[in-house]
């Protein structure tokens, strides 16, 4: 998704075909060395036998395994309904109502405007998702529901999901490329020149991007150490949501925000240590002077044909020993990740401009650009972000 809170999120991301550049030779990815078809392994052959399933259901130990797998399969099957239950809970503001007080069903129905019988079904579903709980005749907010309305940007993101779900309504046509994804034009509209026609929409999604960027910044700065940095430059940093968090942690650290001129014209100079550097990383060189450059939720917004030249420009801008920090949701590679390889991979595909990449793919691109000492700190929350550091040799 767009990485920050204003037009810089899209202005350097005009739609281009995904994968127009050469794909890294990572196993399982386009462009990888060919591999001959193999045999189905033993355990999978067992799982393909209906007769063995029936036998395992009767065995004291094996029935636990089959039951657990059955529950996992049904969780996948019912996933869309779960997401729609969550959207309904958000739209009826159930969690916010319960954050103020616990209510019996009749009074809760009055506050939501729903008929009691339908609200009862919704509340049971929300309780099954552990968002709410029922105690002593009252519906109450559960810890998970409290966390949901507390995490910045999460509720707004759920409200945004129908745009993505409309694109995925026919997944066969979507994957074959037979439809024009609505999401591909959504963010350029929200943060582009037409946004002046719907200022409320732009403001709402600007806040969403700023909120989500703060969460990414928090996780990123827990994984990297900037105490020895002389100047940090955030490339494609929008109006500065990431650097704002950096400034709070390192108030004396000089900062540079690099983005398009019209983006910087609405950015807030929140620190006396902050400099603006207008430019386009597509068309202009990256300014020199920073020994740490950050790319936060930038790479997955762009195809390889944009990312590879960008990494080369960053390498040229850094001094020897300078560091590049990349922070974004990354694919799992050899160990597929449920959040990134399902949600973010399909989200970026619907945007029609970028793709999620595994750490190994990014490492290969960095080495091709001339970087050395590529490392990946242990990820705190891969569904929020992962971090890769690299050094100019």
From Swiss-Prot:
Name the residues that bind S-adenosyl-L-methionine: 259, 297
Q: Quote the catalytic activity from the record.
A: demethylspheroidene + S-adenosyl-L-methionine = spheroidene + S-adenosyl-L-homocysteine + H(+)
Pathway(s) served = Carotenoid biosynthesis; spheroidene biosynthesis
Name the keywords, alphabetized: Carotenoid biosynthesis, Chlorophyll biosynthesis, Methyltransferase, Photosynthesis, S-adenosyl-L-methionine, Transferase
Q: Which domain of life is it from?
A: Bacteria
What segments bear the compositional bias annotation Low complexity?
Answer: 26-36
According to the UniProt entry, what is the EC number of this protein?
2.1.1.210
Extract the SUPFAM superfamilies matched here.
S-adenosyl-L-methionine-dependent methyltransferases, Winged helix' DNA-binding domain
Enzyme class, top EC level, equals transferase
Q: Which Pfam families match?
A: Dimerisation, Methyltransf_2
Region (Disordered), start-end ranges? 1-36
Tell me a GO biological process for this protein: photosynthesis
Which InterPro entries does this UniProt record tie to the protein? COMT-like (IPR016461), O_MeTrfase_dom (IPR001077), Plant_O-MeTrfase_dimerisation (IPR012967), SAM-dependent_MTases_sf (IPR029063), WH-like_DNA-bd_sf (IPR036388), WH_DNA-bd_sf (IPR036390)
GO molecular-function terms, A-Z:
hydroxyneurosporene-O-methyltransferase activity; O-methyltransferase activity; protein dimerization activity
**Family matches, as Gene3D superfamilies:** Vaccinia Virus protein VP39 (3.40.50.150), Winged helix-like DNA-binding domain superfamily/Winged helix DNA-binding domain (1.10.10.10)
Cited function:
Methyltransferase that mediates the O-methylation of 1-hydroxy carotenoids. Converts hydroxyneurosporene to methoxyneurosporene or demethylspheroidene to spheroidene. Also able to produce spirilloxanthin.
Q: Which family does it belong to?
A: Belongs to the class I-like SAM-binding methyltransferase superfamily. Cation-independent O-methyltransferase family.
Protein name as annotated: Demethylspheroidene O-methyltransferase
Q: What is the lineage of its organism?
A: Bacteria, Pseudomonadati, Pseudomonadota, Alphaproteobacteria, Rhodobacterales
């Amino acid at each position: 998704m767009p990485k920050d809170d204003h037009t810089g999120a899209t202005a350097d991301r005009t739609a281009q075909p995904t994968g127009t550049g050469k794909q890294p030779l990572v196993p399982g990815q386009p462009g990888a060395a060919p591999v001959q078809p193999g045999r189905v392994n033993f355990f999978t052959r067992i799982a393909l036998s209906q007769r063995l399933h029936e036998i395992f259901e009767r065995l004291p130990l094996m029935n636990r395994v089959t039951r657990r797998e059955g529950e996992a399969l049904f969780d996948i099957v019912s996933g869309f309904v779960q997401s729609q239950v969550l959207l309904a809970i958000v739209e009826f503001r159930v969690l916010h109502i319960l954050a103020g007080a616990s209510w019996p069903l009749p009074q809760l129905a009055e506050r939501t405007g729903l008929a009691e019988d339908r609200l009862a079904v919704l509340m049971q579903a929300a309780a099954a998702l552990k968002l709410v709980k029922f105690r002593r005749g009252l519906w109450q907010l559960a810890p998970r529901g409290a966390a949901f309305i507390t995490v910045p940007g999460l509720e707004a993101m759920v409200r945004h999901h129908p745009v993505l779900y409309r694109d995925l309504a026919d997944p066969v046509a979507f994957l074959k490329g037979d439809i024009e994804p609505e999401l591909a034009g959504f963010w350029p509209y929200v943060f582009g020149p037409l946004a002046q026609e719907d200022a409320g929409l732009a403001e709402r999604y600007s806040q969403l991007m700023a909120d989500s960027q703060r969460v990414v910044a928090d996780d990123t700065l827990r994984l990297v150490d900037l105490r020895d940095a002389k100047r940090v430059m955030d490339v494609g940093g929008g109006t500065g949501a990431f650097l704002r968090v950096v400034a709070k942690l390192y108030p004396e650290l000089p900062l540079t925000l690099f983005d398009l001129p019209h983006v910087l014209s609405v950015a807030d100079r929140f620190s006396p240590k902050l400099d603006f550097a207008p430019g386009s990383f597509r068309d202009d060189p990256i300014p020199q002077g920073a020994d740490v450059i950050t790319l936060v939720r930038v790479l997955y917004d762009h195809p390889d044909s944009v990312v590879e030249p960008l990494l080369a420009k960053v390498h040229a801008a850094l001094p020897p020993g300078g560091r590049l920090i990349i922070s974004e949701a990354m694919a799992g590679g050899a160990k597929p990740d449920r959040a990134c390889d399902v949600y973010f991979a399909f989200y970026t595909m619907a945007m029609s401009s970028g793709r999620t990449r595994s750490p190994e793919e990014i490492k290969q691109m960095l080495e091709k650009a001339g970087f050395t000492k590529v490392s990946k700190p242990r990820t705190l929350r891969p569904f929020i972000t992962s971090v890769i550091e690299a050094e100019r040799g």
